[in-house]
Amino acid sequence: MYIMRSSFNFLNLLVSDKMIKKIEILNNSYVEEFIEKTAELCNPSSIYLVTSEEDKEYIRRKAIETKEELPLKTLGHTIHFDHPLDQARARDDTFILTDDKIPFVNTKKREDGIREVLSLLKDSMKGREMYVGFYSLGPKNSIFQHLAIQISDSPYVIHSENILYRLDFDDFKGNKQFLKFVHSKGELDIKKRRIMIDLKEDTVYSVNTTYAGNSVGLKKLALRLTIAKAVKEGWLSEHMAIIGFEGDKGTHYFTASFPSGSGKTSTSMMGKLISDDLAFIREINGVARAVNPEIGVFGIIQGINSKDDPIIWEVLHKPNEVIFSNVLMTEDGYVYWEGSDDKRPERGINYEGFWSNDMNKPASHPNARFTVPLTAFKNLDENYDNPDGVEIEGIIFGVRDYDTLIPVVEAFSCSHGIVTIGASMESARTSAVIGKGDEYEFNPMAILDFMPIHLGEYLGNYLEFCKKLKKVPRIFGFNYFLKEGNRFLNSKEDKRVWIKWAVKRVEGSVDVIYTPIGLVPYYEDLKTLFREMLNKEYTIEDYEKQFTLKLDKYLEKNERILKLYKEILAPKEVIAELEQQKERILKYIDKYGKRISPLDLR
């Protein structure tokens, strides 16, 4: 058996005999080396390996003992507070380590970045315990699986990992490679907050932060690593939900990509839940099949109420393992968040300290979160952990657009959908990133924040993936947020109709109207669906307000996106699709004018 004697001599000082035996059982020199190097760098007082249900319970206790989490009245519920300036993903402090300049990617020279973050991590765990968690991204015993190790001095971070990911110690036996994540909360000096992503070594370093988007490695930090892997290997690692929607001919699985805070989680609750956030997609025998790399949900809590979100509401109120973060803890040991239909409390504690109702400040942060296991959801699909994944028949790209995009459109083809819908996404920014709310930003596939490589290379892989498929999913563009003045033109429940129409398109049971930007529903089909699903009268005036094409606005958008992709030297196929779309729009403007109702195209 291969044993790193130098490693074991060092680790024996920090690790119990029981833990040493666990490492010996693995017989994995990469694991030994990773733990040793991190321990030597961060200088913890002890090391604890998280490999079993017993260890998960230990982490729960440590989270309470260290006061990183506080217990609440409801059994299994705890609350965590992040630093007031550490409430969202830190774009400006997150770097892809490469010597190349990449459009839209925050890069730093690899050598400089490694040197900087290692200096910040030096002795960062002094006086603390170092936790080592062994996980599987994706179902075990699956072609989709990627192994990962998270090292952290934060019980909250490891507790979150234990809820969100499959603990999988045994699969590290033998010299298997894995993704590596090193996190230390350090001194929580926000000026020295750094997240460094080293694609060359499949390693992410994170320091002086606890917000989960910056610290829980297997979440959005791992997404950068797996996107790069997917492009090299010809599959897709996506910021997408996976949902099974019921149709007349059975369950049809869709992926759904929305920017944060734009409807992805609520859409996931409309069907059978497999994933609310991430998807690994592979071509298997000519079919696109997908799995959820996770087994939990880290969701935005603001606005969740019993009427609009009954499933999530139930999950958050029943005895169950839940970590609330950056909401209000009430005096009687419960929680409150903005948009909840619980009674607003008079006072409590939040991430800024004492709060009272007369302070005229929100009780919770707009990016406050909940972390729960998938098994808590009553709409969980039976295939959520299927190692073979599920067949994807539809792909949804959704945005938060107040002015231009119609509620639902279907692409002419896979490449048309990828380029003119997915790769052309512009959406109002939300509080999940540090910056101004409601600013429009270019966000293709809702993944630009996590892009580790050239966007053109990523899109090229998407287009090639499409070509490999014998059975191609239909692609749809969704927009739940169209307004007339300051008034939304749709209710939250209306999304059920757009989803049902997409399902009927997959089943081939409704026809469409051809327009220059894609295929749109007939009024009569939507009227029927509104009546059947929502018991609601859908008028022809509603239809015209929602589906009249603002061709001048679509043209402006097309020009912006085309210019952008030309500047970054995107693949020729991307440019061609956008130029063809431009030609179609111009022809229709010449014939019908700048605004056109689908009723005039029948």
Swiss-Prot record:
Cofactor(s) this protein requires: Mn(2+)
Organism name: Sulfurisphaera tokodaii (strain DSM 16993 / JCM 10545 / NBRC 100140 / 7)
Biological classification of the source: Archaea, Thermoproteota, Thermoprotei, Sulfolobales, Sulfolobaceae
Enzymatic reactions: oxaloacetate + GTP = phosphoenolpyruvate + GDP + CO2
Pfam families assigned: PEPCK_GTP, PEPCK_N
Manner of cofactor binding, per the entry note: Binds 1 Mn(2+) ion per subunit.
HAMAP family named among the record's database cross-references: PEPCK_GTP
Name of the protein in its database record: Phosphoenolpyruvate carboxykinase [GTP]
Active site annotation, chain numbering: S262
